[in-house]
């Protein structure tokens, strides 16, 4: 009798375990089915969104973009703009070429470039003047003259390094656009180029002397004369057509001897 009890009690326990496993499997199947349907719905929505986005892009691509092109009045009757197959970019390119070939625009560009170079040359930092004032302030208690200060300072034993660096500072401080045939030679500078110093170079020494206001007065006169000469050259510039395919630029400027006494 005791041996039959476990056998009788055994099948209901197995049935309960099988029932629990079946319910768990059914719930898992339902959950996986629900998540699969959600993913499918999300994919469908995203597909609709992408299709609508591509449709908008295609519509924008097909529609022509209207752009405003400003064409000068002197070029409206030009034959190269009346071609029916020209696009807006090609018309703009042709107008830019015609604008460059215009004499007034070319004159403006030349004057702007010249004035830019001229002002850039005047705004170069004066390294030598600053260096000189710094050294003279250090030795002002012993010597009163800046010239003697430079002489005594350069004649010292450690003057070789400063003498080697001085020509570079002179070039930076006195750099200007070339006006005439005279230029900065190695170790020398013309009187009209130097506003505040006279430079005398010897084989082993470098001397700097102050200059009066009369020496740099011709420099200002040269600047005004050059600007007047540039304006005369700009006014006499013209474009002459040679044939039907190309044009040449003719500039008639006065000689320097007649413009500058």
UniProtKB/Swiss-Prot annotation:
Name this protein carries in UniProt: Protein FAM216A
Family of the protein in this entry: Belongs to the FAM216 family.
Listed InterPro entries: FAM216
Region described as Disordered: spans on this chain: 1-52
Compositionally biased residues, Basic and acidic residues: 36-49
Source organism (scientific name): Rattus norvegicus (Rat)
Signal peptide annotation: none
Comp. bias regions, Polar residues: 23-35
């Amino acid at each position: 009798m005791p041996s039959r009890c476990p056998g009788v009690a055994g099948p209901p326990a197995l049935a309960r375990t099988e029932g629990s496993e079946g319910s768990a499997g059914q719930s898992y199947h339902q959950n996986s089915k629900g998540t699969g349907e959600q993913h499918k719905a999300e994919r469908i929505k995203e597909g609709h969104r992408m299709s609508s986005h591509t449709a908008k892009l295609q519509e924008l691509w097909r529609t022509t973009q209207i752009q405003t092109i400003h064409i000068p009045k002197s070029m409206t009757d030009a034959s190269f703009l009346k071609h029916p197959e020209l696009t807006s970019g090609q018309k703009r390119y042709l107008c830019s070429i015609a604008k460059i070939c215009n004499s007034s625009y070319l004159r403006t560009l030349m004057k702007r470039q010249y004035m830019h170079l001229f002002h850039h040359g005047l705004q170069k930092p004066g390294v030598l003047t600053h260096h000189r004032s710094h050294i003279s302030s250090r030795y002002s208690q012993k010597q009163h003259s800046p010239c003697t200060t430079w002489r005594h300072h350069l004649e010292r034993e450690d003057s070789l390094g400063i003498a080697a660096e001085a020509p570079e500072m002179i070039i930076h401080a006195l750099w200007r656009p070339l006006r005439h045939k005279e230029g900065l030679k190695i170790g020398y500078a013309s009187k009209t180029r130097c506003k505040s110093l006279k430079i005398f170079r010897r084989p082993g020494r470098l001397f700097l002397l102050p200059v009066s206001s009369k020496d740099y007065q011709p420099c200002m006169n040269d600047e005004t004369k050059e600007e007047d000469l540039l304006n005369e050259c700009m006014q006499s510039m013209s474009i002459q057509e040679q044939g039907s395919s190309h044009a040449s630029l003719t500039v008639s400027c006065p000689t320097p001897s007649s413009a500058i006494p």
